[in-house]
Amino acid sequence: MKIDMRNISKSFGTNKVLEKIDLELQSGQIHALMGENGAGKSTLMNILTGLFPASTGTIYIDGEERTFSNPQEAEEFGISFIHQEMNTWPEMTVLENLFLGREIKTTFGLLNQKLMRQKALETFKRLGVTIPLDIPIGNLSVGQQQMIEIAKSLLNQLSILVMDEPTAALTDRETENLFRVIRGLKQEGVGVVYISHRMEEIFKITDFVTVMRDGVIVDTKETSLTNSDELVKKMVGRKLEDYYPEKHSEIGPVAFEVSNLCGDNFEDVSFYVRKGEILGFSGLMGAGRTEVMRTIFGIDKKKSGKVKIDDQEITITTPSQAIKQGIGFLTENRKDEGLILDFNIKDNMTLPSTKDFSKHGFFDEKTSTTFVQQLINRLYIKSGRPDLEVGNLSGGNQQKVVLAKWIGIAPKVLILDEPTRGVDVGAKREIYQLMNELADRGVPIVMVSSDLPEILGVSDRIMVMHEGRISGELSRKEADQEKVMQLATGGK
């Protein structure tokens, strides 16, 4: 299959996101699509797969003009799109999610459970994973859910597979399994569009790379004929001399302390964070880092343990109590827990601080709009309009909206779970700079990250977890990748 996208433009109201795009895709090739968040990568692929139409332009498939009315039509034609955010039903089982809308039936019209199970297990085997078929998908980790999304697409007869940040929530082993599958698909003649910000993956797996910036294509070339410095410069329009901005904040006394905390999947977790300090939490997927943070914030139930702010013990059983105590929490899954996608930017940003903008029972629209506009400008959110629906923003700009929401409460402590997941290199640096600015003001920050270079580049101290327990603590000076991984795998 050969796809030619010609003169594709797209606007949402007055917001132009694509302008005169020409792109060729070919079966049997792995084609990287790179660019900062907001460059238009996902929008272009959404047009290809029928989620919404182009404002102008034409799509040719094997020389014939063709458009799809919805993603289902595209899938039936052999073009599938695995989105960055999960497209699953948490209450339904793994098997039900896999075959939703594509159920296999017997000659009597009944569900052919045996054949569906067989196909599901065969697909999981190709991916190199073992996941129970009869448990609710909501009980699985983000990484496992991502693997199911990938498996779902593999159940189709594929010609072109579009993958948007497919490894963002995967372990190293799962990533290697994915690469094996992608290489196998290529050998079978399937074309893969690989949207990613991870340079090492681009050079490891792709044949061609296209760079987008501000809704236009900057360049397309064979991956082997370019390098990471050139790609970064083309993505952001400048060279990133220093990936992690230098931190100048003075670290003060202990401001946030957790003692002997126990909950689901973790026990006896103790740590502290000082004013102006960024404390990194590292560990393999399933180590319990996210569960600890969710318990502190009152999402998950605490079994035992104490939490203190400024040496005062606090009681938290719900997120609303955590917010009242001054705790902000950016969750790892922004779509389901961090944002209301149908709401606009202003409504999302002011959700935790509504009372601050209310006087005598009335919401102060003028003050809140001014406040939100200041945050939009400060975080370089690409829209410029507080009334723009959050669902129309790129993943990176959505992440900035979640950050702005918690900055708005003037937090006493800020917990960030995978703050730069799915975010491009330019936006990552902006987020790191914002973290440094907050630390300069004395805000203690806890950062959970699966990105080891990020942990090493941003953290003042590093806590490492293994199988639900703290396995070690490292200072910034003594930490390196080998020491962190040794602790993360249970070594000493």
From Swiss-Prot:
Keywords on record: ATP-binding, Cell membrane, Membrane, Nucleotide-binding, Repeat, Sugar transport, Translocase, Transport
Main localization of the protein described in the UniProt heading: membrane
Any one cellular-component term (Gene Ontology): plasma membrane
Disulfide cross-links: none
GO function term, MF aspect, one: ATP binding
PROSITE patterns documented for this protein: ABC_TRANSPORTER_1, ABC_TRANSPORTER_2, RBSA
List of residues binding ATP: G35, E36, N37, G38, A39, G40, K41, S42
Domain ABC transporter: 3-239, 238-492
InterPro entries: AAA+_ATPase, ABC_carbohydrate_import_ATPase, ABC_transporter-like_ATP-bd, ABC_transporter-like_CS, P-loop_NTPase
Annotated localization: Cell membrane
This enzyme's EC code(s): 7.5.2.7
Membrane topology summary: Peripheral membrane protein
Catalytic activities: D-ribose(out) + ATP + H2O = D-ribose(in) + ADP + phosphate + H(+)
Subunit structure: The complex is composed of an ATP-binding protein (RbsA), two transmembrane proteins (RbsC) and a solute-binding protein (RbsB).
Known function: Part of the ABC transporter complex RbsABC involved in ribose import. Responsible for energy coupling to the transport system.
Family to which the UniProt record says this protein belongs: Belongs to the ABC transporter superfamily. Ribose importer (TC 3.A.1.2.1) family.
Name the record gives this protein: Ribose import ATP-binding protein RbsA
Protein's gene: rbsA
